């Protein structure tokens, strides 16, 4: 008798957090696709122990769980390039969720190659930006992989439905129908969405904040700190050399204590709608403030102004999920050139939600007191300004003469 050939089960790698959405996706994938589910949890500095997820993932039906410590790679390869670029989305958002997704997707693709998986799955909803960020990264890194996005397929239409689905299958979830906030946390930030925040008229409750306090509840005494940068990268705090993750964690603690980095905004999502989010980014706000101050001291006018223009495009690329792209790499090359002399020390004052400059110095400073002084000086001939003004204003003068001659004025 011929032995019947056993066809191996196809595999899918799931971006797994242990939260509501990804918890119910495991049984759903098995029930609807018949795939073996391999879960991957990324440690990006969520501030929680991920080891307990092993038991939960297996009980939910996964064959195995990868727990990947990506914190240092996250800071050095994703956060620091964005910081050096000065990228801020719509003037407020420091992109904490945006640049985390391409890194997670990158590791999913690597595990899929190792396991021989044919598909990647994620728990992003069909209304959000994360679905785009995950899938663009996968397409850029391995276009042969199938992508499964359950929220765009299944009959579950709300978080309440998802909770019911989980309860039916005995899967514990950390969300209740009474407080259905969606939170995303990593070493850079903590975001809050959903629930009563969906009405932009509602002020965030004080107990919402987890990384810090409301500014009015911050200490009544200011705190000063000094940050040292080398070529645009922060390397030490108050004279002490710290690793990338430790530095950011320390700044989060100090900044959070003083209510630094709380942003409440209505933003334009890539998928066409507006959404309201409350973000806590204490350490990131401190780093952006310090880095910008040092750039203003060390970059010439033309470079600084042009860099501010490309910062807008860089922020759009990161927000839109186009991290793995030739344009982003090209912009990085430009930014790296601008950062060669962004080295020095910045002193900041933290007080009740405010992070203000209290001093800046650099061996590459372009500020010259001799030229800038309003007192007596011997290096600047003020008479030279007349010729400059005449030439710079010539187009305006010619136009005014033409309008006068033609009777337009």
UniProtKB/Swiss-Prot annotation:
Assigned EC number: 6.3.4.5
Annotated TM spans: none
Pathway given in the UniProt record: Amino-acid biosynthesis; L-arginine biosynthesis; L-arginine from L-ornithine and carbamoyl phosphate: step 2/3
Principal localisation: cytoplasm
Pfam family, one: Arginosuc_syn_C
Root EC class: ligase
Residues reported to bind L-aspartate: 125, 129-130
Catalytic activity annotation: L-citrulline + L-aspartate + ATP = 2-(N(omega)-L-arginino)succinate + AMP + diphosphate + H(+)
Keyword Cytoplasm: yes
Positions annotated to bind ATP: 15-23, 42, 123
Annotated disulfide bonds: none
Subunit: Homotetramer.
The protein, known as: Argininosuccinate synthase
Lineage, top ranks: Bacteria, Bacillati, Bacillota, Clostridia, Eubacteriales
């Amino acid at each position: 008798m011929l032995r019947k050939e056993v066809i191996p089960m196809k595999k899918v790698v799931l971006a797994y957090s242990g939260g509501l959405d990804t918890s119910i996706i495991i049984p759903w994938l098995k029930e609807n696709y018949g795939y073996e589910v391999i879960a991957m949890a990324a440690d990006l500095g969520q501030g929680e122990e991920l080891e307990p997820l092993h038991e939960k993932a297996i009980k939910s039906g996964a064959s195995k769980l990868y727990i990947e410590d990506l914190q240092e790679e996250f800071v050095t390869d994703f956060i620091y390039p964005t910081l050096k670029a000065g990228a801020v989305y719509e003037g407020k958002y420091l992109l904490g969720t945006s640049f985390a997704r391409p890194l997670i997707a990158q590791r999913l693709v690597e595990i899929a190659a190792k396991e021989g998986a044919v598909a990647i799955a994620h728990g992003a909803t069909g209304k959000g930006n994360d679905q785009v960020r995950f899938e663009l990264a996968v397409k850029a890194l391995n276009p042969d992989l199938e992508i499964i996005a359950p929220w765009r397929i299944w009959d579950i239409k709300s978080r309440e439905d998802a909770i019911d689905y989980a309860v039916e299958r005995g899967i514990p979830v950390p969300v209740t129908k009474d407080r259905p906030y969606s939170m995303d946390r990593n070493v850079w930030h903590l975001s809050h969405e959903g629930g009563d925040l969906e009405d932009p008229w509602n002020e965030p409750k004080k107990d919402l904040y987890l990384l810090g306090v409301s500014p009015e509840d911050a200490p009544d005494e200011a705190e000063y700190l000094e940050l040292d940068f080398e070529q645009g990268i922060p390397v030490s705090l108050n004279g002490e050399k710290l690793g990338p993750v430790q530095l950011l964690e320390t700044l989060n603690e100090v900044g959070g204590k003083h209510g630094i980095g709380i942003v409440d905004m209505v933003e334009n999502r890539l998928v066409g709608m507006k959404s309201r989010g409350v973000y806590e980014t204490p350490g990131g706000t401190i780093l952006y403030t310090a880095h910008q101050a040092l750039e203003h001291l060390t970059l010439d006018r033309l470079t600084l102004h042009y860099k501010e223009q490309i910062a807008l495009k860089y922020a759009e690329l990161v927000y839109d999920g186009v991290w793995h792209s030739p344009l982003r790499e090209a912009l990085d090359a430009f930014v790296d050139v601008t950062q060669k002399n962004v080295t020095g020390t910045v002193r900041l004052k933290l007080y009740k939600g405010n992070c203000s400059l209290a001093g800046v110095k650099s061996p590459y400073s372009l500020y010259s007191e001799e030229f800038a002084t309003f007192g007596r000086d011997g290096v600047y001939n003020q008479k030279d300004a007349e010729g400059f003004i005449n030439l710079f204003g010539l187009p305006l003068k010619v136009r005014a003469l033409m309008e006068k001659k033609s009777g337009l004025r």
